[in-house]
Curated annotation (Swiss-Prot):
A motif (Secondary area of contact) lies at residues 73-77. Belongs to the cystatin family. Phytocystatin subfamily. Gene3D superfamilies: 3.10.450.10. This is Putative cysteine proteinase inhibitor 11. GO terms for cellular component: extracellular region. InterPro entries: Cystatin, Cystatin_dom, Cystatin_sf, Prot_inh_cystat_CS. The lineage of its organism: Eukaryota, Viridiplantae, Streptophyta, Embryophyta, Tracheophyta. It comes from Oryza sativa subsp. japonica (Rice). Specific inhibitor of cysteine proteinases. Probably involved in the regulation of endogenous processes and in defense against pests and pathogens. Disulfide bonds: none annotated. Residues 1-24 form the signal peptide. Keywords: Plant defense, Protease inhibitor, Secreted, Signal, Thiol protease inhibitor.
Length: 120
């Protein structure tokens, strides 16, 4: 069996390059979305999540204020993890909530995967 030291070096270099790539660069990894305040799509996703949460019959009756942070995961469409500043009409307070919203290829609307009060 012939040996190919050059091929081995190329293979090792490729493995090293892949190993040092951050997880955010992988398909399926979560990527931070910069400038969420100026990103109209992300603000719409956050507002939709609050509206959907209210439709589910919760007693919170939240009012959307703004998305303060977001990440995107590209899969078959996109998943958005959004941190939402919302006002509670019942509690008379503003708190942060974390929602995961799916925007699937071929779907006509978003899907709310989770919505919960952010932990500190």
């Amino acid at each position: 069996m012939a040996r190919h030291p050059g091929l081995l070096l190329i293979l090792l270099a490729a493995v090293a390059a892949v190993a040092t790539t951050s997880r955010a660069q992988w398909v399926g990894g979560w990527n931070v979305i910069e400038d969420v305040a100026g990103n109209n799509q992300i603000q719409r996703v956050g507002a939709w999540a609050v509206g959907k949460h209210n439709q589910l019959g919760t007693n919170d009756r939240l009012q959307f204020v703004r998305v303060v942070a977001a990440e995107e995961q590209v899969v078959q469409g996109s998943n958005y993890l959004v941190v939402i500043d919302a006002a509670s009409s019942r509690k008379k307070t503003r708190e942060l909530y974390v929602a995961v919203v799916a925007d699937l290829v071929g779907a006509t609307t978003y899907q709310l995967s989770s919505f919960k009060l952010a932990t500190k």
